[in-house]
Amino acid sequence: MPYPKKVTIKEVGPRDGLQNEPVWIATEDKITWINQLSRTGLSYIEITSFVHPKWIPALRDAIDVAKGIDREKGVTYAALVPNQRGLENALEGGINEACVFMSASETHNRKNINKSTSESLHILKQVNNDAQKANLTTRAYLSTVFGCPYEKDVPIEQVIRLSEALFEFGISELSLGDTIGAANPAQVETVLEALLARFPANQIALHFHDTRGTALANMVTALQMGITVFDGSAGGLGGCPYAPGSSGNAATEDIVYMLEQMDIKTNVKLEKLLSAAKWIEEKMGKPLPSRNLQVFKSS
């Protein structure tokens, strides 16, 4: 299959990038950074999480951030929503899309959110129904699709079963997560073959971690199979919680650079994106793993 002519990058740095970081980023700095990202040409930014502050203290200012940002025309501002209370707060903050989440691995789901996958499905169905009543779309994250830190391999049958249940709820898109950064192109092909036999490619997104340096190679395989939506985090912000010190989220600017070199449109202005990544790197007080950011700083 030929490469697509256009790809959508969904920026998750302000949520997924910051949520596990020990450094507190002030509310006004979060707002400034999101506003910078809004002016890069990105059409989608996941700005925060409405998970209880007890679990994600780094994003305890979620409502203030959501209310404080500038809203650029044509940009969807999304947030992670764990339950109906979180959805109520997200609606108060003026969020455009609710992002729900669960694991394909039973063990990881229990350790991560203290629920069975069946219990999670029940909650997410309620959240999705309430979001639709409020005229919000719902995006679902399914993590540990390509490997679990506890169970190792996750059966493809389990991934298919949970994906079918989520789509039956009426979610608009399913983002498949490589939580431990263990995926390889052959595995990506196998998983996508199974899912694309059941679901349309335009409702599947991929969220790769670059822990072992395979994120971009995995994306090329997905592109060849018709996937046109990928998650990225500016600067590569957000480490892998199961491999301390290792790279986590794929850097948005590395994805954009690769796609541009392949003549695939993203509508993202790379230099503005790099400036935003450099800005948050300075606020974090540590080097971020993005390759293109390092080149940008040295030029």
Curated annotation (Swiss-Prot):
Keyword terms of this UniProt record: Lyase, Metal-binding
Pathway listed: Metabolic intermediate metabolism; (S)-3-hydroxy-3-methylglutaryl-CoA degradation; acetoacetate from (S)-3-hydroxy-3-methylglutaryl-CoA: step 1/1
Record's keyword annotation contains Transferase: no
Reactions listed under catalytic activity: (3S)-3-hydroxy-3-methylglutaryl-CoA = acetoacetate + acetyl-CoA
One annotated GO biological process: ketone body biosynthetic process
UniProt subunit comment: Homodimer and homotetramer.
Binding-site positions, a divalent metal cation: D16, H207, H209, N249
Source organism per UniProt: Bacillus subtilis (strain 168)
Protein name (database record): Hydroxymethylglutaryl-CoA lyase YngG
Ligand binding (substrate): R15
